[in-house]
Regions:
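A generic, well-ordered mixed alpha/beta core segment in the N-terminal half of proteins
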Residues: 68-134
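Conserved mixed alpha/beta catalytic, RNA-binding, or beta-rich assembly cores of soluble enzyme
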Residues: 137-214
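Translation machinery proteins
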Residues: 37-61, 117-122
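Domain-length cofactor-binding catalytic modules of enzymes
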Residues: 10-13, 28-29, 211, 215-290
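Flexible, glycine/charged-enriched surface loops at secondary-structure junctions
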Residues: 22-30, 41-46, 60, 100-114, ...
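Short, small-residue-biased leader/transition segments that mark boundaries at the very start
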Residues: 1-8
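Short acidic, glycine/serine/threonine-rich loops at helix termini
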Residues: 74-76, 84-86, 154-156, 198-205, ...
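Conserved phosphate/anionic-ligand binding catalytic regions in large, soluble enzymes, centered on
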Residues: 59-75, 182-200, 260-268
Length: 290
C-alpha cells in the first residue's frame, strides 16, 4: 500500500522546491532567448530575470512572490496501490504545512467572501489531477504553483468545424497580443485543441506546463506547434510586454478527439518563472526532480 509512503512532508517539500528552484529546461530557454534578443530593452529585462533566478537560488528565496494556486498532477503506474483519499489528505496537509511552516503567502481565498484561511487550501483546492501510466511500480507527483498573471489570461473558443485550422492559429495569435505584458513574458503558450470545453481548457494547461523541448505526441499537433512558434516571436510583444524578440519560450499544443460538430480551442499561458517540481516514488525510494 503506497499511501503510507506518500507523506505530507514530501508533498510539502515539492511545493517549496517548485517555488524556489527553476527547472533546467527553463534556464536553458533563458540562455537561448538571451543569445538571440536584439531589442535593447528586451535584452536588459532578460538579464534582470536571469539575475533574479540566481539570487533566488543562491539565497534559497522564492523565485516570485506569487505562490499561486497549488496544482498536483498525480500519475499512477502499473502495480501501484494507492489509497486515493489518504493521498488527497496528504496533499492538503502538505500544502498547509508548506504555507504555515515555511512560511509562505497564502494566495487562495473564497471566491465570494475573499476570506483567506492562510493554508493555500480551500474548496477543490489544491487542484488534484489523476492520470495513469505504464511505468511499473512508479508513482509520480508533479507540483505546479500557477500564478495569477498567467492564469488570468486564459481563453476558450468554441469554433465551428468549418472554421478549420486557420481559426485556431488566428485565435492563439490574438490571445498572445491581447495578453501583452500581463502574463510576464517570455511565456510558454499552451494550446488545447479538441475534446469538450472542460477537456480543451485542461489540455491547454497541460501544454503550458510541459517541459521545454518536449513535443506534442500527435503529429498534427506537433506541426501546429511549429507553425505557431514561428509566428509568435515575430509579434514584438517581448519580455514583460515592453518590446523585443522574446515573446515566448515556445508554443505547446495538446490535442484530443472531439465531436463532429465541434472545433474547440483554448489558450493558457505560463509566465517566465515556469515553476514545477516532481516527487517520484518507486520501491527503491523517493527522488525529487522536475
Amino acid at each position: 500500500d503506497w499511501s503510507s509512503d506518500v507523506c505530507s512532508s514530501d508533498l510539502k517539500e515539492i511545493y517549496i522546491r517548485a517555488l524556489k528552484l527553476l527547472p533546467p529546461d527553463i534556464k536553458e530557454g533563458f540562455k537561448r532567448l538571451d543569445a538571440t534578443e536584439t531589442h535593447p530593452t528586451g535584452k536588459a529585462i532578460l538579464g534582470t530575470m536571469i539575475r533574479n533566478i540566481k539570487v533566488a537560488e543562491d539565497n534559497t528565496n522564492l523565485l516570485c512572490q506569487d505562490t499561486g494556486i497549488p496544482i498536483y498532477n498525480v500519475e499512477i503506474g502499473t502495480g501501484v496501490a494507492v489509497d486515493g483519499y489518504a493521498l488527497k489528505q496528504a496533499i492538503i496537509k502538505g500544502c498547509t504545512r508548506a504555507t504555515q511552516e515555511h512560511p509562505l503567502r497564502s494566495s487562495v481565498v473564497h471566491p465570494t467572501t475573499r476570506k483567506n484561511d492562510h493554508t493555500s487550501c480551500g474548496r477543490h483546492v489544491p487542484v488534484i489531477n489523476i492520470d495513469f501510466s505504464n511505468k511499473n511500480n512508479e508513482l509520480s507527483i508533479e507540483m505546479i504553483p500557477k500564478g495569477s498573471g498567467s492564469e488570468y489570461n486564459s481563453w476558450l473558443k468554441m469554433a465551428l468545424p468549418a472554421d478549420g485550422v486557420d481559426v485556431i492559429k488566428t485565435f492563439v495569435i490574438d490571445c498572445v497580443l491581447e495578453a501583452g505584458g500581463k502574463t510576464c513574458p517570455p511565456t510558454i503558450v499552451g494550446v488545447g485543441v479538441g475534446g469538450t470545453a472542460d477537456l480543451c481548457v485542461h489540455l491547454s494547461k497541460v501544454a503550458a506546463t510541459r517541459a521545454l523541448g518536449s513535443q506534442c505526441a500527435d503529429p498534427e499537433g506537433a506541426q501546429l506547434e511549429k507553425a505557431l512558434s514561428a509566428v509568435v516571436n515575430k509579434l514584438g510583444v517581448g519580455p514583460q510586454g515592453l518590446g523585443g524578440d522574446s515573446t515566448a519560450f515556445a508554443v505547446h499544443v495538446e490535442t484530443a478527439a472531439t465531436h463532429i460538430t465541434l472545433n474547440p480551442v483554448a489558450v493558457n499561458m505560463q509566465c517566465h518563472s515556469a515553476r514545477r517540481a516532481r516527487a517520484t516514488f518507486t520501491p527503491a525510494g523517493l527522488s525529487y526532480g522536475f
